[in-house]
Curated annotation (Swiss-Prot):
Motif, YRPW motif: chain positions: 289-292
UniProt protein name: Hairy/enhancer-of-split related with YRPW motif protein 1
Domain bHLH: start-end pairs: 49-104
Gene3D superfamilies: 6.10.250.980, Helix-loop-helix DNA-binding domain
Role description: Transcriptional repressor which binds preferentially to the canonical E box sequence 5'-CACGTG-3'. Downstream effector of Notch signaling required for cardiovascular development. Specifically required for the Notch-induced endocardial epithelial to mesenchymal transition, which is itself criticial for cardiac valve and septum development. May be required in conjunction with HEY2 to specify arterial cell fate or identity. Promotes maintenance of neuronal precursor cells and glial versus neuronal fate specification.
Chain residue ranges for the region called Disordered: 1-53, 194-234
Organism superkingdom: Eukaryota
Length: 299
């Protein structure tokens, strides 16, 4: 009885390739004894040299990919914003790069070589990051709830102000670079509805509000080191405390806090300003003393 012979139609090159693959797999697994015993010294040295060259080439390729991804993480604004909070995967960086290029293509090519637009983009990202840090500080360090009036009004005001600045920068894209200190005084500030005075306590303040931003802009450009404080309409305490007229009534930590936030043209009426010289007023308010000067000044 004849046995069925296998089909030898395949070429000898395929068989040699299979043997070579088995040898390479043996090299990768570290079992070199069985693979090298059947080869001549010249063939084994060639295999080892090829494997060594392949490892060097692979390492260089990985280094180029990692360097390119690091540059993309630094250049793409959305990836640069998230790099401090969480570790980005390679696929996420590539996706953010594609989205950024699509956005630039949709904008008609504007921003490719516009250094001012890129600086404004990074500035808005920095402002948003500082806003998130303020919210985290008030909730974690100070222990304020998410429904606390101080936290809600401050965060909503800063968020509204950031939106206004982004809209203003988009409308006036043809202007030159405007520094932070003088940029806040050029555009009238529209107060957030939560920051408006209630029950007629701020009638005098609302009457002077149309001309107030212009005066604040002039004062900010002429005296950038002076904090922009508004005079209170009355001396009594209401639901919203009036702003202290002179900086001498503030405690030293709050003085440094106001000096560091002098560029922001929002009213400090939502903060309970406590002074060591008035212990009775501090006792009546029932609010804990919060020395924010050193923390905010550090930023």
């Amino acid at each position: 009885m004849k046995r069925a012979h296998p089909d030898y139609s395949s070429s000898d090159s395929e068989l040699d390739e299979t043997i070579e693959v088995e040898k390479e797999s043996a090299d990768e697994n570290g079992n070199l004894s069985s693979a090298l015993c059947s080869m001549s010294p010249t063939t084994s040295s060639q295999v080892l040299a090829r494997k060594r060259r392949r490892g060097i080439i692979e390492k260089r390729r990985r280094d180029r990919i990692n360097n390119s991804l690091s540059e993309l993480r630094r250049l793409v604004p959305s990836a640069f914003e998230k790099q401090g909070s969480a570790k980005l995967e390679k696929a996420e960086i590539l996706q953010m790069t594609v989205d950024h290029l699509k956005m630039l293509h949709t904008a008609g090519g504007k921003g490719y070589f516009d250094a001012h637009a890129l600086a404004m983009d990074y500035r808005s990202l920095g402002f948003r990051e500082c806003l998130a840090e303020v919210a985290r500080y008030l909730s974690i360090i100070e222990g304020l709830d998410a429904s606390d009036p101080l936290l809600v009004r401050l965060v909503s005001h800063l968020n509204n102000y950031a939106s206004q600045r982004e809209a203003a920068s988009g409308a006036h894209g043809g202007l030159g670079h405007i520094p932070w200190g003088s940029a806040f005084g050029h555009h009238p500030h529209i107060a957030h509805p939560l920051l408006l005075p209630q029950n007629g306590h701020g009638n005098a303040g609302t009457a002077a509000s149309p001309t107030e931003p212009h005066h604040q802009g002039r004062l900010a450009s002429a005296h950038p080191e002076a904090p922009a404080l508004r005079a209170p309409p009355s001396g009594g305490l209401g639901p919203v405390l009036p702003v202290v007229t002179s900086a001498s009534k503030l405690s030293p930590p709050l003085l440094s806090s106001v000096a560091s936030l002098s560029a922001f043209p929002f009213s400090f009426s939502s903060f309970h300003l406590l002074s060591p010289s008035t212990p009775t007023q501090a006792a009546n308010l029932g609010k804990p003393y919060r020395p924010w000067g050193t923390e905010i000044g550090a930023f």
